[in-house]
Amino acid sequence: MSRIGIFYGSSSGVTGKVAEKLAELLGEERCDLYNMEEDFVDFDDMLKYDHLLFGCSTWGSGEVQNDWRDPLLELDNEKPDFSGKTIALFGAGDYVSHGEQFVSALGVLYDKFKARGAALVGSFPTDGYTYEYSFAVRDGKFVGLPFDKINEVDKTDERLERWIAVLQEEFLPA
């Protein structure tokens, strides 16, 4: 059974908790968790997996979470090849305080890793979300799973279960 690498940045712990929940739902025995601040060394950590989940919250006016900033600069400079890798994205946002850039960091990750050859899967419907704008919306869907653990905590578990069903079809290795 092929392993899944789950890489996440989490300033307040929210994205980390969702990463742990995803590992539980996908089967902890097949998942390796990497906190970008504590565990990430270089892209070889990611490239050893064919299937990856990246978790990143959005801060301020659409910026990626701090732990992703340097690795994304390195991605641009080193240009590692992610061809043959399948990536799904998830991330926290706050539609009340930052509805003008709701989970836009996912759009940044999407563009960066797509440009490096990765196949990105796991898009999620925008239905049921309230926001003004999101850079993470492409072709009418979010590029990954957005969640708002501040204003919509009651919807997170149901959305996770729906996203797992999407991943069962598009992502999960045999």
UniProtKB/Swiss-Prot annotation:
**What family does this belong to?**
Belongs to the flavodoxin family.
This molecule's function is given as:
Flavodoxins are low-potential electron donors to a number of redox enzymes. AvFld 1 is able to donate electrons to the assimilatory nitrate reductase of A.vinelandii to catalyze the reduction of nitrate to nitrite.
Report domain Flavodoxin-like positions: 4-168
Question: Per its record, what are the GO molecular function terms?
Answer: electron transfer activity; FMN binding; oxidoreductase activity, acting on NAD(P)H, quinone or similar compound as acceptor
Flavoprotein keyword on record: yes
Residues that, per the record, bind FMN: 10-14, 89-122
Task: Give start-end of the signal peptide.
Answer: none
User: What induces the gene encoding this protein?
Assistant: Is the predominant flavodoxin expressed when A.vinelandii is grown on nitrate as nitrogen source.
Record key words, sorted: Electron transport, Flavoprotein, FMN, Transport
- Tell me which InterPro entries the record gives: Flavodoxin, Flavodoxin/NO_synth, Flavodoxin_CS, Flavodoxin_lc, Flavoprotein-like_sf
Q: Which cofactors, if any, are listed as required?
A: FMN
Q: What is the lineage of its organism?
A: Bacteria, Pseudomonadati, Pseudomonadota, Gammaproteobacteria, Pseudomonadales
Give the disulfide map.
none
Q: What is this protein called?
A: Flavodoxin 1
